[in-house]
Swiss-Prot record:
One Pfam family matching this protein: ZF-HD_dimer
Oligomer status and interactors: Homo or heterodimer. Interacts with ZHD1, ZHD3, ZHD4, ZHD5, ZHD6, ZHD7, ZHD8, ZHD9, ZHD10 and ZHD11.
Region (Disordered): 1-40, 100-160
Organism: Arabidopsis thaliana (Mouse-ear cress)
The protein's name: Zinc-finger homeodomain protein 2
Disrupted gene: phenotype observed: Arrested at early embryo stages.
General function of this protein: Essential protein. Putative transcription factor.
Organs and tissues of expression: Mostly expressed in flowers and, to a lower extent, in inflorescence, stems and leaves.
SUPFAM superfamilies in alphabetical order: Homeodomain-like (SSF46689)
Biological process according to GO: embryo development ending in seed dormancy
Main localization of the protein described in the UniProt heading: nucleus
Length: 220
């Protein structure tokens, strides 16, 4: 599912996006940086995009999220890929928006467009709703999920789990610590060489570093 399809889903649900909605053209109230962090224009506030709230079971009247904990842009600022999460493949507006003011207090911006509208039922009837899917934490350090883009038909996202050998995990850990758990532009040559030597794709390495930097990364 591309960005246009995702925005059409929000329109078809009959609910307007929350304030601060960022369109594909990039004309929004905020601008984002790497790691789901941005700064609002004209206001000294930092913006973060936290867990993904997209409802993948809206077509069957249920509620299920993918477990992505924080937005991570797939591309550089100013590109369409910058609005797409590299971890879950969803548009940035599906992630919970959190604004941190100068004083350091976080303000959560509510998101309304992820839960499907409930059909009206006359009083006196038992109202049944589908149970929410249990929270699924990010993949452990031994395995990593490489998420493909959702199909245009709106079906469930396919996930392919990548298995790493002990040698690959050891090399990725050492390489991630050397880069400071973040791939920057000047690291492209080293990353390409590392991927060629280990057989791990760049995108898989990037997602692995994102999911494991808090659990495996050295404390400052």
């Amino acid at each position: 599912m591309n960005f246009e399809d995702q925005e059409e889903d929000m329109e078809m649900s009959g609910v307007n996006p929350p304030c601060g909605y960022d369109s594909l053209s990039g004309e929004g109230a905020t601008s984002s940086g790497g790691g789901g962090v941005g700064r609002s224009k004209g206001v000294g506030a930092k913006i973060r995009y936290r867990e993904c709230l997209k409802n993948h079971a809206v077509n069957i009247g249920g509620h299920a999220v993918d477990g992505c904990c924080e937005f991570m842009p797939s591309g550089e600022d100013g590109t369409l890929d910058a609005l797409k999460c590299a971890a879950c493949g969803c548009h940035r507006n599906f992630h919970r928006k959190e604004t941190e003011s100068i004083g350091g207090r976080a303000h959560r911006v509510p998101t309304y467009y992820n839960r499907p509208p409930q059909p009206h039922q006359p009083p006196g009837y038992l109202h049944l709703t589908s149970p929410a899917a249990p929270y699924r934490p990010p993949a452990a350090s031994g395995d990593e999920e490489d998420t493909s883009n959702p199909s245009s038909s709106g079906g469930t996202t396919k996930r392919f789990r990548t298995k790493f050998t002990a040698e690959q995990k050891e090399k990725m850990l050492a390489f991630a610590e050397r880069l400071g758990w973040r791939i920057q532009k000047h690291d492209d040559v080293a990353v390409e060489q590392f991927c060629a030597e280990t057989g791990v794709r760049r995108q898989v390495l990037k997602i692995w570093m994102h999911n494991n930097k808090n659990s495996l990364g050295k404390k400052p």
